[in-house]
């Protein structure tokens, strides 16, 4: 594959870039780039103005599709350096409000809700799942005031145990963490450097999520808080061998199943953050000639230092070209388990409860009236 970097914008082709940085991440729904080059006075730069549509290609393979965000010009008497940056079309979903007539859906799937919210932004939804659980319809789904499209769809995705990301075509993708290993990174061969960090400061032996269940009686009754605070879920981390409990208070009414899923998500998220690999790879392409991209499952072999791992997920990729680093790829990797999304109900839309009142308000009111009964985990 050629390493030629081509920016297509405003019906023109821009090449010859001397500095390149293209980043895509499984934890972000928008890839982004920054390109730089020195140009002589009089160069027409109108096609690189902020707001212009673009397609960025490397060796003919698309790596980013969206809109130019910024253009910077640094000038001397004889030359000018221009730096252009942009993001995928899906960036608008992060920045902008979720707007839909009526603000709610009934008996619609996550895919259908996503298509409705993405349509005004010209963003295509790619659904890569076939299981019944992820495709189950929501009895009801309601937008929060002022939430963005991204925030609304994250909430819906968690309720279906789905990973939401984007691809190089600027599409919003619903998928799951890759399960088949593709490449092996061998230190001293295709792997130039490896930074392996294990940090257990934010990991705990047990995660307990406590929630609220609606008690019998009318609002204003002098009921015992113990009859209200009755739902909980627990997840454990067998790698943390000493006693390190963590308690999380749910922000709304929750079932035991939801509490269990929330505890598991917290355990997995902290696992992924605690064991990380930062690797530098020679070149931009994998063994099959394709560019490095997120959501690939790889192995690392640094046997010289007694490190050999399997099932590491590529969570972030940055393709780099500059005078200091040359041409290389930086990748972030973490255990695949940390990117498995447990199913959580959409608590806001469960019948009889919401996130701005209901049982939460009742509990808080009870403790305001009876501060002596406030449990330690609420102090």
Swiss-Prot record:
Residues 344-353, 365-379 have a biased composition (Basic and acidic residues). Keywords: Host cytoplasm, Late protein, Viral baseplate protein, Viral contractile tail ejection system, Viral genome ejection through host cell envelope, Viral penetration into host cytoplasm, Viral release from host cell, Viral tail assembly, Viral tail protein, Virion, Virus entry into host cell. It is found in: Virion; Host cytoplasm. Disruption phenotype: No tail is synthesized. Residues 344-379 are annotated as: Disordered. It holds the Pfam family Gp44-like_2nd. Residues 209-228 bind DNA. GO terms for biological process: symbiont genome ejection through host cell envelope, contractile tail mechanism; viral tail assembly. Its main location: virion. Disulfide bonds: none annotated. InterPro entries: Baseplate-like_2-layer_sand, Baseplate_GpP, Gp44/GpP-like_2nd, Gp44/GpP-like_C, GpP-like_N. Induction: Expressed in the late phase of the viral replicative cycle. Expression of late genes is activated by the viral late transcription activator C. Cleavage of the C-terminus gives rise to a shorter 40 kDa form. One of its GO terms (cellular component) is host cell cytoplasm. Heterotrimer of one uncleaved (42 kDa) and two cleaved (40 kDa) forms. Forms a hub-like structure with an inner diameter of 25 Angstroms through which DNA can presumably pass during infection. Part of a complex composed of three DNA circularization protein N, three baseplate hub protein gp44 and three sub-complex wedge (made of two copies of each baseplate protein gp46, gp47 and gp48) that forms the baseplate. C-terminal region forms a flexible domain. Forms the central cylindrical hub of the baseplate and plays an important role in baseplate and tail assembly. Core component of the initiator complex that triggers the tail tube polymerization during tail assembly. Forms a conduit that probably functions as an extension of the tail tube allowing viral DNA release during ejection. Might facilitate the interaction of the virus with the host cell surface through electrostatic interactions during virus entry into host cell. This is Baseplate hub protein gp44. It comes from Escherichia phage Mu (Bacteriophage Mu).
